[in-house]
């Protein structure tokens, strides 16, 4: 998030140095992904992303061009992601209330909500702009209702404005990209820029590319703030020079940073919250220099004000997080990164106490930081030298208090942090265990539909309870008693308590399921291979139910899961058992597919392209959840993107279009990176939310199953180094990537609408799509994409046939879908 | 807009049109009769005090402190529960009887001083009652308005003992009244 | 879960139904919302009305005070009120009297007219004050009634039981017990679940301890203590038994055997069992707010207790082990390497019931073979064992009332030993190979410092640079890294792949140790540390809260003050080299500017924000001011004034740091020769009032220096002519 | 056939039951020495019984329990033996049966608020006063007012708050400060 308004201030003051990129030749550069992404996706970019969903394609474009330059100069980048959030950050992001307050603010107007641009949190701004975008869009639609026939309207109001993009959402996609291209990455246990500082200090890297927050660390002398590739330059900040120029001590600087708002303490504290953001740092600095303001003292002195208690608390937590931030050390353990303080030897004891009582970071300001004046009067300097000669300086680490968990978060086992660091888990479940809250935040489409809310409440039984049990069982028993709740944005006051304890535990019920094939270490896991393996067995119960459990240490390595393929297959089978695609009873030695499982096992037989397998599973689980029939309107109904004219003249075909667009939300159009600006469709987006929710939950359940298997010791964890984990395991994890955007669905929607109105002329319809979606840039092979997505529809249609045969879906839905696909076939082949 | 339910439990300070201030927690807001009920005692105290204020009588309402965490019907610690009507009836009868007894000790349309004199005498002599605006003690002595020492009359002859006692009581009472008056003035 | 949802649904349905049944109309007031602030539906209205009706019904028969719209107050006995009135509440008072005559009349005048009963219509009732309302009367009343009737009932029950004594071997259903003669609908037992809220905790208030012990509630205890509903306990009260099951008698025997086992445990040394059997935990630590919100402050203690328990401790006996990980060797060694004293083939046999001695034995000793002789327990026994162990280990330090100490003599001593935490190691790292973080950091620092000296600064800055509006773009020449240029190192990459990996690193550490060990045959096999070794808290070096590291208000302000003065001192010395630092202070105090209210000049910083809402910080533009040669001559005079006022370097009346008005930046400009216009800044306190500073006026040739001390103790003025 | 067993019913011997009953004093809530040692036994027994059941059966029962809606909640903790009261007793009649039911309920759930009964009672009460005004030497405030000196000067009942203040025509006008706080949360 960076220290508010500091960057522009430094530029104005000319305190940002620049170097030619050559200067970084051969170096290892650590990059804070949060900071980096916020530089790449500035305000003007990806403004309509939130209206279509999916991964910001332009990000990939910028990333690729940067990586190319790094390569030219032989710079080795290491990307460091942010991990868990500290209490201050959680509160600011609305974690504990699932952003319900922000969601409600966004529904009212800005003026009445009582927040201004300075005090509003990023989450609030994001939701506010999103709702503004949709409101404008609705108005636009209704005003154009009469004129709109088949020419889709383009939205005018951006859906993102002046907010930082949350890089967390795209973490998995980025990690997948880094693994694929062989770049190094790491997910920090908490703050990413602290991890950078640790790596720099322990000489693993040569330079860091991070946010202005790095100025708060006195162990970082200089860091890179930005890259200007067109000029082949980079911009950097030199700490000592900045401090000298500002004329304040390091402690005062930290005080200012805490007051204006920074990554560790995101809210702007009084008296600064009434000023516009761009001037914050400037004003705060003036106050310190001219009136000797200490912002902590200010908070203490205004105890009568409403929020003063929280402000003091936030300030203290911010400072403390700065002093004691966990980092992943090279020993593989997560420990606090405690900076040293300078104390004079003889006063060591006394000063230590005084130092403790100071809200400023170091007791000996004169020696540890630049003094405000360049020259000192004779008397004063004599005095100083005298003082110096009499005492020796000692560096010692700070004392660590006993309630670090109150401002950072409770500690998890090192092993869990390791899995987070390699991107094996997204970490949302870890955060839930640490904070006691699993937030269900509003999805892109707002989530007002009853079916989505139903899905959220159903997820407790289907996914969440199992996940929590699997993850709390192997760790400190405090977590087995700790209450963990699902908090929903639409009813933040009515949380659902998740069950940590079951007997027998979830792991015990599935740990006899083992898929062990004689495969090479290199065999890649895929759902298709998994199906082949399962179908290859003549007696499932015999082949996949193991008499003995394999996790104890006494079991020899050979009998454990010895290849990544076996590890992932075993846990995928367990996942399917938990999803009731298979029934399993250890006592009865029973393992057989349910009707859903039978359909799943047929995917290879049906010649479904293996790249669609994951989508099909998501689709099956969605149908199994049974919250919304495929042809059922969401409640309350969302406005259709089709025109009134279409809906009235072609009711039957409109229904076809509905089914087609819904299924196509599973299909990602092959795009060239670009900032999207084209038609949008809320109805389709809302349906996408459903599938996206299913996918996220499938991912988390699989993560939980996998972690329970790994921590118990079923897999030889010593057999891989970090790159091995990434390349052989993380890379093949299913359900990791963001769900597709709605572009392909919309292309078909408007294609078919035009086709209907234009006397069934395909070419006109295609050229309409080409112009409306600007495809000459983004999708050069439009025809090919239509053919490809049509193939996808046909494959889904095969699956539907099986589902119908197994009586798992309504026959009417099946017939309707078949007709709909036929309709697309005629349209495309006309 | 917010559900009215959420107003429950707020600590508020109500200033009415006479500038009388009441502080407490919002217990109920009734749009059906346009009143606001405030619980003026602390939560865990028993018995409780309340004040029902008519909304038109409110000049200004101010929230003290933060939003309560328990602002819904479900979370109130006073919730309507079963009321035994018989019990209410019984209590009413009992208190009417008790009040009647007390009522006899209050003079109708008498001055505050008069009532004070009566109370003081009653403390010492149980057989003291009002007859119209006169205080009658032991059916022997009468004190008439304005109840000064001069106003003590003997009804029957030969009860000097009691009369001196009553004189002393009345005298002392007036002294006390004047003191109180002086204090008020200062 | 499903059941819960269904229940909730049905309850809302019934509520709706109830609503339609009731003929209660809203008294003609349309229930719609005129303003956008709140909305209200019939459901809410009804709930609110119920609340008020309930209160009023309970106030019948108590003394109330009615304030009528004229301000007169009447007190009297509330005998009736009209719940249907639409404009206020109609009230009937018995024995009314005037409590306060309000503005106008004398009491006498008003009192004259009162009768025995007074009906005040709602439109006149401005306020109705209800005092001393006891809302628990119904409960008390029921109790007293119940006590009267119970003995009789008990006798009847007794007789009936005697009559049926032939049915000894049968289990009796509710229907049996309540008598087969009556016709009664069969009903299922339901578990008592506490409502959300505090009621079930409040009930115990004000009762003697004995009452509580009988009605001790397991669910309440668990929920109260841990915020967890124990799944296990739920079976205790809700189990149904199927007599027709063929295995019924077998199971019954089994059950009785287990029951006996459990009963024979006794409470000695186990606070948990003691609690469950009706010994009360002291509630005094919880105030109502806590009970109310369901937040248990003991969570911290719980955490602390866990912390101490999770610390590996060789003295401890049976450790609790998660069920998942049973049948594995467990180790008490805090080091990352788990060591066991048994050989590999023994591992399979050893269970977690191995004796403390075996577990805690030092490395050198030959392995003891205790575990082999033990029979492995049946799974059921193991489960009980599990529970027992869990409850033994799971202790939370509580305050125990004095009279309970007798009962808990033994367990309290255990508590004591538990509450004192063992001293913690500062670093857990067992490996000798890894460098301690301290040295690493300092090494890194000195290295970067060295490199720092080689950098040519892009811009030399002296004192205060004025802000330049254009950003300076100047390229640095030379190297970003100083002397030591980085070079790509493949080893680094490999290192990165191996480090940050707890498995590999701990194995390395283990092997390292093994190499150093002569008797390598005795070395234990390597195991990866189990995740449950990690406590939910971070390692600390002192037993204090982070909050204690922050100063109190005075200290913080003082610190800021000192810093501020120091800066002024330095900047003065810097600006006027020939001057005495003492002068600097006084100058600092003097260099103020006249300042009007916030309305003095249009303010560039305001940007439409409400002024004065918080402490506004108001910059302003003074008239250009010029340096005059006569100024230094005035200095001594002013200096003496300063001395008179007790102004040495530090004024005795030091205002709060952020309230002080001081020049700071202007002083830097003061050193320049010639007239230089400069911008001054003036602080204002949180109240929005301009700070109390000194003022300086100029009138043509004559100058008045008017100095005010911060607290206005003393004023003096001097005037000089050119 | 399914038998329901609870902690309060010990069916193994009638003598135990008798002991329990005779032990409980006039107020069956009060603990007596004879009751306490009994309690863990029952707990232990039920605990064991729970364990002796196969898991699946338990689950089925759990499910069945969830589906059923009990006619009346019962508090199984009390030592008193449940006597099922006819629904009419919920209204709080004062028969021995009814009060014992109430007593049983006291701990588990306060009985629900009897809205209709309270309203009709209050209504009747008010009627009795307003209808028989004279019998109680009843005066209304209006009468009192007219008899006093100030009464002749007409007193405005509306203090002009509604019309004069900013809350004009707003139903919830006086709650605006609360609304502000709620919005800013």
From Swiss-Prot, chain A:
Compositional bias (Low complexity): 361-373
Family annotation (Pfam families): MKT1_C, MKT1_N, XPG_N
Listed result of changing residue 453 to R: In strain: ATCC 24657 / D273-10B, ATCC 200060 / W303, Sigma 1278B, YJM 1129, YJM 270, YJM 627 and YJM 789
Range of residues in the leader sequence: none
Keyword field: Cytoplasm, Isopeptide bond, Phosphoprotein, Translation regulation, Ubl conjugation
Annotated region (Interaction with PBP1), positions in chain: 130-380
Gene3D superfamilies per record: 5'-nuclease
Any Gene Ontology biological process: positive regulation of translation
Leftover remarks: Present with 3430 molecules/cell in log phase SD medium.
Name of this chain's protein: Post-transcriptional regulator MKT1
Annotated organism of origin: Saccharomyces cerevisiae (strain ATCC 204508 / S288c)
Gene name of the record: MKT1
UniProtKB/Swiss-Prot annotation, chain C:
Subunit record text: Interacts (via C-terminus) with MKT1 (via C-terminus). Interacts with FIR1, IGO1, LSM12, PBP4 and PAB1.
Low complexity: compositionally biased ranges: 307-316, 338-347, 356-370, 412-421, 456-471
Subcellular location: Cytoplasm; Nucleus; Mitochondrion
Species in which this protein is naturally found: Saccharomyces cerevisiae (strain ATCC 204508 / S288c) (Baker's yeast)
Note: Present with 2870 molecules/cell in log phase SD medium.
PANTHER family given in the database record: ATAXIN 2-RELATED, ATAXIN-2 HOMOLOG
Entry's Gene Ontology BP terms: cellular response to glucose starvation; maintenance of rDNA; negative regulation of TORC1 signaling; positive regulation of translation; regulation of mating type switching; regulation of mitophagy; regulation of translation; stress granule assembly
One Gene Ontology term, aspect cellular component: nucleus
Record's protein name: PAB1-binding protein 1
Family of this protein: Belongs to the ataxin-2 family.
Domain Sm: 51-107
MF terms in GO: mRNA binding; protein-containing complex binding
Role played: Involved in pre-mRNA polyadenylation. May act to repress the ability of PAB1 to negatively regulate polyadenylation. Negative regulator of poly(A) nuclease (PAN) activity. Promotes mating-type switching in mother cells by positively regulating HO mRNA translation. Localizes MKT1 to polysomes.
Record note on disruption phenotype: Abnormal mRNA processing; 3' termini are cleaved but transcripts lack full-length poly(A) tails. Decreases HO mRNA translation.
InterPro entries linked: ATXN2-like (IPR045117), LsmAD_domain (IPR009604), Sm (IPR047575), SM_dom_ATX (IPR025852)
Pfam families: LsmAD (PF06741), SM-ATX (PF14438)
Sites bearing Phosphoserine, chain numbering: 106, 215, 436
SMART domains, A to Z: LsmAD (SM01272)
Cytoplasm in keyword set: yes
Biased composition (Polar residues): 11-38, 429-455
Primary localization class, coarse: cytoplasm
Keywords: Cytoplasm, Isopeptide bond, Mitochondrion, Nucleus, Phosphoprotein, Ubl conjugation
Region (Disordered): 1-38, 305-380, 412-488, 683-722
Residue ranges with Basic and acidic residues bias: 1-10
Comp. bias intervals (Basic residues): 698-722
Crosslink feature (Glycyl lysine isopeptide (Lys-Gly) (interchain with G-Cter in ubiquitin)) location: 344
Curated annotation (Swiss-Prot), chain D:
Record carries keyword Lyase: no
Subunit structure: Interacts with IGO1, LSM12 and PBP1.
Record's compositionally biased regions (Polar residues): 73-83, 91-102, 147-166
Domain of life: Eukaryota
Misc. remarks from the entry: Present with 1560 molecules/cell in log phase SD medium.
Location in the cell: Cytoplasm; Nucleus
Keyword Cytoplasm: yes
GO cellular component: cytoplasm; cytoplasmic stress granule; nucleus; peroxisome
Protein name as catalogued: Protein PBP4
Source species taxonomy: Eukaryota, Fungi, Dikarya, Ascomycota, Saccharomycotina
Main location: cytoplasm
Ranges of biased composition (kind: Low complexity): 1-24, 46-62
Disordered: region residues: 1-116, 147-168
Keywords, in A-Z order: Cytoplasm, Nucleus
